[in-house]
Swiss-Prot record:
Protein name, as recorded: Indole-3-glycerol phosphate synthase
InterPro entries the record matches: Aldolase_TIM, Indole-3-glycerol_P_synth, Indole-3-glycerol_P_synth_dom, Indole-3-GlycerolPSynthase_CS, RibuloseP-bd_barrel
Name of the top EC class for this enzyme: lyase
Organism: Cupriavidus necator (strain ATCC 17699 / DSM 428 / KCTC 22496 / NCIMB 10442 / H16 / Stanier 337)
Origin organism lineage: Bacteria, Pseudomonadati, Pseudomonadota, Betaproteobacteria, Burkholderiales
Pfam families registered for this protein in UniProt: IGPS
Record GO terms (molecular function): indole-3-glycerol-phosphate synthase activity; phosphoribosylanthranilate isomerase activity
Amino acid sequence: MSDILQKILAVKADEVAAARKKRDLPSLRAEAESLRTEPGLAPRGFERALREKIAAGQAGVIAEVKKASPSKGVLREHFVPEAIAESYASHGAACLSVLTDVNFFQGHADYLKRARGACPLPALRKDFMVDLYQVYEARTWGADCILLIVAALDPGLMAELEACALELGMDVLVEVHGDDELDAALRLKTPLLGVNNRNLRTFEVSLDNTLDLLPHMPADKLVVTESGILGQADVKRMRDANVHAFLVGEAFMRAPDPGVELARLFA
């Protein structure tokens, strides 16, 4: 595990401990479970939204609402989650990915609530999930999907987090960085398999990461390529390899209008 990832996970454990002191788990769980059928807050179907786009011959784009990153610093000074989400929705995005990590990505729970509330798209809580508390928390914030990072979790905990999310009606995107993590990911029930093209140790990005893993992917998995999609040539390279789901952040966040850039990139 990389030093930066270890540092992030230590902070996450502290965050969960602090959150539990403010609100106990039974109370949080009860609220999360009550939202299964709540108008406007019930899960919107993250996987379904991706598959519908792909079935229509389009790319399934998970468009990121991200202010900053540890490696690149602030990506977007004028950061208005509602406006970004509306722009994505009107320019063909399938889903949103909203950073909720405060300390490393300058994200916030409110960004998720505001972005999802401004458009009809399902939203991923993009964060480092290490505890069941965060899964219930994600649902109360409106998340339709959570991210599970194989490099950050032991298999038992990962399965427990997935089961909790599925029970609440959410989808799960499991993320791998290399073939050494694939076996653990494939033991989960979720069909959503993300491949992060960014090396968590060096922060270098290579689209070969996705392409190298493709031969090892079962046919029933929906592969999402993450990081490093910066131009139309990158999109073409992936789609030529039969990868049609993308998680893109930086390219959109640096553009004057994120949604317009999405439409241009995936034209």
